[in-house]
Curated annotation (Swiss-Prot):
<keyword id="KW-0175">Coiled coil</keyword>
<dbReference type="InterPro" id="IPR010908">
    <property type="entry name" value="Longin_dom"/>
</dbReference>
<keyword id="KW-0333">Golgi apparatus</keyword>
<comment type="function">
    <text>Vesicular soluble NSF attachment protein receptor (v-SNARE) mediating vesicle docking and fusion to a specific acceptor cellular compartment. Functions in endoplasmic reticulum to Golgi transport; as part of a SNARE complex composed of GOSR1, GOSR2 and STX5. Functions in early/recycling endosome to TGN transport; as part of a SNARE complex composed of BET1L, GOSR1 and STX5. Has a S-palmitoyl transferase activity.</text>
</comment>
<feature type="domain" description="Longin">
    <location>
        <begin position="8"/>
        <end position="127"/>
    </location>
</feature>
<dbReference type="GO" id="GO:0005783">
    <property type="term" value="C:endoplasmic reticulum"/>
</dbReference>
<dbReference type="GO" id="GO:0015031">
    <property type="term" value="P:protein transport"/>
</dbReference>
<dbReference type="GO" id="GO:0006903">
    <property type="term" value="P:vesicle targeting"/>
</dbReference>
<keyword id="KW-0449">Lipoprotein</keyword>
<feature type="domain" description="v-SNARE coiled-coil homology">
    <location>
        <begin position="138"/>
        <end position="198"/>
    </location>
</feature>
<feature type="propeptide" description="Removed in mature form">
    <location>
        <begin position="196"/>
        <end position="198"/>
    </location>
</feature>
<dbReference type="InterPro" id="IPR011012">
    <property type="entry name" value="Longin-like_dom_sf"/>
</dbReference>
<feature type="lipid moiety-binding region" description="S-farnesyl cysteine">
    <location>
        <position position="195"/>
    </location>
</feature>
<dbReference type="Pfam" id="PF13774">
    <property type="entry name" value="Longin"/>
</dbReference>
<keyword id="KW-0808">Transferase</keyword>
<keyword id="KW-0564">Palmitate</keyword>
<keyword id="KW-0931">ER-Golgi transport</keyword>
C-alpha cells in the first residue's frame, strides 16, 4: 500500500490550477521522477476538470487509483495511490486536508494561487503519515486488530481441534486400559481366591 501524490487544486470557470501538492516518487528510478511527478500533476488537473462540484470519485489507471473530491466551493483534492490502498482512508484524508486548507488559506487567494504563493505546508507530513493507513486511520487500525484477532482465534481453534484429536486417542486408550485393568483385576482376584485366609 502506497500513496504517491496528494494535491489541492482550484476548479475555476475555465481552468483547473494546482494550489499545493506533495509527492512520494522514491519508488521510481531517479531519471523518471520528474516525468512521473509532471504526469501526476497533469492527471490530477484533468480528473478535477472532468469531475462535478460536490462529487467524490475514483479513477483507475493501470495499477494506480486516483481519488478525487471536489467541494461545492470549487476547492478540490486528489490522492494518487496504488490499488491496495483503502479508498475510504483516501477520502478521509482528502476531507481533512481540504477542511484544514480552507481554514488556513484565504478563499480570495484560491483563484489566483499557485504552489509558490500559497502558504500551506502540511501536505508533505500528511503524505508521509498516511503511507501506512493502519497508523493514520483509527478505523483501519481497528479493522487490522480485528483481522489479527480472527487469525489468532482461527489458529487457536485449529490447535484445539488437533488437541481434541489427541484427546480422543487418549480417551480410546484409557477405555482399552480400563478394560485391561478390569481383566487384570478379575484374573488377579481368581488367582488370589485360592489363598483366602479364613
Amino acid at each position: 500500500m502506497k500513496l504517491y501524490s496528494l494535491s489541492v487544486l482550484y476548479k475555476g470557470e475555465n481552468k483547473v490550477h494546482l494550489l499545493k501538492s506533495a509527492y512520494d516518487v522514491s519508488s521510481f528510478s531517479f531519471f523518471q521522477r520528474s516525468s512521473v511527478q509532471e504526469f501526476m500533476t497533469f492527471t490530477s488537473q484533468l480528473i478535477v476538470e472532468r469531475s462535478d462540484k460536490g462529487s467524490r470519485s475514483s479513477v483507475k489507471e493501470q495499477e494506480y487509483l486516483c481519488h478525487v473530491y471536489v467541494r461545492n466551493d470549487s476547492l478540490a483534492g486528489v490522492v494518487i495511490a496504488d490499488n491496495e490502498y483503502p479508498p475510504r482512508v483516501c477520502f478521509t484524508l482528502l476531507e481533512k486536508v481540504l477542511e484544514e486548507f480552507s481554514t488556513q488559506v484565504d478563499r480570495i487567494d484560491w483563484p489566483s494561487g499557485s504552489p509558490a504563493t500559497i502558504q500551506y505546508n502540511a501536505l508533505d507530513s500528511y503524505l508521509s503519515k498516511y503511507q501506512n493507513p493502519r497508523d493514520a486511520d483509527p478505523m483501519s487500525k481497528v479493522q487490522a486488530e480485528l483481522d489479527e484477532t480472527k487469525i489468532v482465534l482461527h489458529n487457536t481453534m485449529e490447535s484445539l481441534l488437533q488437541r481434541g484429536e489427541k484427546l480422543d486417542d487418549l480417551v480410546s486408550k484409557s477405555e482399552v486400559l480400563g478394560t485391561q485393568s478390569k481383566a487384570f483385576y478379575k484374573t488377579a482376584r481368581k488367582q488370589n481366591s485360592c489363598c483366602d485366609i479364613m
